[in-house]
UniProtKB/Swiss-Prot annotation:
Domain of life where this protein originates: Bacteria
Gene it is expressed from: clpP
Known role: Cleaves peptides in various proteins in a process that requires ATP hydrolysis. Has a chymotrypsin-like activity. Plays a major role in the degradation of misfolded proteins.
Name this polypeptide is given: ATP-dependent Clp protease proteolytic subunit
Keyword vocabulary terms for this entry: Cytoplasm, Hydrolase, Protease, Serine protease
Species this chain originates from: Dehalococcoides mccartyi (strain ATCC BAA-2100 / JCM 16839 / KCTC 5957 / BAV1)
Length: 200
């Protein structure tokens, strides 16, 4: 039986040369749109990074849109995406649809200044870095030091892209911290709420 999360819509394009079927993500990629719509792990990061690099190669002067609806995930995978976003030549516009939580919030705020958006009913969420460890006490201590190191990296990224002080970022991310789209604008995580233009 096919599960709904494995169904990818197909789009038929007609031209003088006939019809051609594209999966929806390939069609979006042709329009320089990447969709991050799942938990962040190494496989998802590899796909997003490959798309970013491809679009950089295709046209280094044309913006890329990264739509985000993600609960976050693995920090190292998220940082790989973050570093690639900062490395490539095109400006990456980020758009939160639904929810951007944890690592996804870091990616959302890391978009090009002035091009970070959320839809009106989006939720943005921050918290401390999380992880787990087991084994000998010395192994657990090593793992704890590493997660604290990663947490410092994430906090510095948030400071850089929001303009907030380190003290405020530390305080606000100490526990679950939820923001509406408007609150995210005021916080500096995004620049604008996207609205449908009113008909005149």
């Amino acid at each position: 039986m096919i599960s709904p999360e494995n169904v990818v819509p197909m789009v038929i394009e007609s031209s003088a040369r006939g019809e051609r079927a594209f999966d929806i993500y390939s069609l979006l990629l042709k329009e320089r749109i990447i969709f991050l719509g799942s938990q962040i792990n190494d496989q998802v990061a590899n796909l997003v990074i490959a798309q970013l690099l491809f679009l950089d190669r295709e046209d280094p002067d044309k913006d890329i849109s990264l739509y985000i609806h993600s609960p976050g995930g693995v920090i190292s995978a998220g940082l790989a995406m973050y570093d690639t976003m900062q490395l490539i030549r095109p400006k990456v516009s980020t758009i939160c649809v639904g929810v951007a939580a944890s690592m996804a919030t870091v990616l959302l705020c890391a978009g090009a200044k002035g091009k970070r958006y959320a839809l009106p009913n989006a939720t943005i969420h921050m918290h401390q870095a999380m992880g787990g460890a087991q084994g000998q006490a010395s192994d657990i201590e090593i793992a704890a030091r590493e997660i604290m190191r990663q947490q410092d990296i994430l906090r510095n990224i948030l400071v850089k892209h929001t303009g907030q002080t380190m003290e405020k970022i530390v305080h606000d991310s100490d526990r679950d911290y939820y923001l509406s789209a408007q609150q995210a604008v005021e916080y500096g995580l995004i620049d604008e709420i996207l609205q449908k233009p009113e008909n005149k």
